[in-house]
Amino acid sequence: MGKKPKYDLILFTILMLLLFAPMVQKRTGWVKMEPLKGFYPSTPYPLLSLKDFRTGDYQKQMEQQLSERFGFREPVIRLYNQYLWDFYRKTYAHDIVAGKHNWLYYEQNVNDYYGTEMYRWLPDAQTARVTFNREARLMWKLRGVLQDYGVEFLMFMAPEKGFLYPEHLPDRKHDTTTINAREYYVAQFEENSFPYIEMTSWFQALKEADTLPYSLISQTGAHWGFSSVLAADSLLRYMEALKGESLPQLAIGPFHESADSTQSDDHDLEMNLNLLRNLRHPYDRLYDAEVTVVTDSAVKKPKVLFIGNSYLWRMHYYIPFDELFEQSEFWFYNSIAYSGPGYKDQTPVADLNLIEKVLDADYVVWFTTGNQMYKATYGFVERALMNFCVEDDKVNKTRESLMDSLSLSWKEANQILINDPEHYFSELAGDSIPTARNSKVRETLVINEIKEDSAWMWNLSTCQTVIQNATLKQVLLMEAQNIIEGKPLMRDMTNIEAKRDRVEQLVADMVEEVRGKPVLMQQIEEKAAKNGISVEKQTLYDARWLVNDKIKRGVINLETP
């Protein structure tokens, strides 16, 4: 009996710790927790209102918010996930499927192997055929358009894990009534003589030969590892053959066991399970080596635009792209453009000049996997064809017509055009390569030619000081228009200082002319008030714009007195 109070004290202490330790941890974070992997949406702290309190919405939001932020949340979730995995081989991780022998797959890889992935994107096999035929035809058309400008467009399909290691997939029933996108597109590419590399078949042969010291794709990973270097070399050699160029070689050093950080990326699916302990990987051989780029005076470093999925990131991890390419960009899912050293610069693709970017490349590579071919090129091919072959005004008017007639938003109307551009634009219809061209294409080609001439660019930068308030980009466009319209070139202008003085005198004369027009001055006063500047400064801005506009239109010729 004497020991009972002691036990009571111990139990009471444990109870208090269980009650208050999470509260203290939440407030102070005194124990450092390893963050959970993956994406977890954050619920904002709810604002209390009488309406939400009475309907129960406030309580639901607060409960959700608290469940995402209680102390020691990370180990509690890992403990629960471990319990689910050990006893039921079950996971709540989005899109991750547990295979046999502790293998992990993305859901779409499993679906594609068993023939059901098509239903995620298309209602039936007939619709799939129509869609795939149209996409393959549009790719062929775009390639023909770009070849006119020395740009090669090709397809690269990385290997699918489900088809490479089907023996570890969970048992499911095959659906034989559907169409496999990878196999269908390969047949279309062969028929259309469209250049492509399909890696699944080749990697299946490599797996059977079993001569490589490293795994092609890891047991619990979604993406390939060092095998991506082998694929990159094949891509380079194929690009060489397409244009008859000598491109850099990749040299592979001695193999060694992969570092822990690299192995963590090789097990990215497992990391997203958020278990307490790591799974065993008896099937993995995780080795890599240093990769160097070999060039000489006869080698050309290409300019490449990649558009596609996350499989490129592992290739980028092992290979020094900055040394391999003169320049390269990666348009991730045709949404975010990664560029610059190490692909550290990010820009929304929608903000970029597509014509300029594509014409600045030697090769445009659509980089994907077979299971993602159901979504084709995420609208890249359609948008590129409209940009290259249809005038901007026509595209805008067609979009506006859809918006007005169907009460659609800009985004909805634009998606209709993307879904079937051949239907809305006669320039893209039919089974032949489009011959119509957007006038912006000629402008871009001329500007690219100017940029290649350093002396020309220097002259234009000098002219920029004459045409004040004009950016170099605007001056380049003005010079391109001069070439297209057969006007005198700014490059050939002489006596720059004298011309600058003349422009300033023309601006001063225009200021006096504007001041003598009461109606115009009233408009300037309204603009000055709106812009928050003085009337004098607004008058100067408007006078300079009028002079620059007359110079641009040829009304004022700086070459004549």
Each language-model region and where it sits:
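Extracellular glycan-modifying ectodomains
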Residues: M1-R515, V519, E526, K530, ...
